[in-house]
Amino acid sequence: MKYIKTAILIAGMAAATAACTRKPVVPQFGMLTIDTLIGTPANGCKIEYRFATIANAEKSPALRSIEAANAGYFFELEEFGGTARQAADSALRQIAAELAFPQSAPQMTEPYEISAEAEAAVTDSLVTYIISRWSYTGGAHGMYATECHTYSLAGGYELSTADLFSERQLLGM
């Protein structure tokens, strides 16, 4: 009888420990695709966005935080805290205001273009976004840029190289 009580107690403690140990919610990625033209074909800006959104962001405060931070980076918005769709709408309004072409403006020789694409990957307890941009808004050539952002799935905060490597390892980089 003593052994049965002990076994039940151990099983209960194991079940309680398992119930209290929560794994972070794994993101399920979707794609927010936007193809639009601001202005006219002769005097306008073609916009192409491919944003890797977290479809299940509402399931975890960490995922909501990651989604909002990455939307801010992707759509180039400071201190943004809304949804990816809200970020896209805000970015399009901002671009339209910055590139307001008067009706009487002469036809451009090359139409303006802005293109951004994000890829996301989960590795262990981290999610990494790679944002690639290309734009032409006048001048001799377009501009390219690539950004990488890594977040903790458990806490939703962005990591830096100092969070991932020791001081000695950082000195060797």
Predicted regions and their residues:
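Compositionally biased intrinsically disordered regions enriched in Thr/Gly
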Residues: 20-173
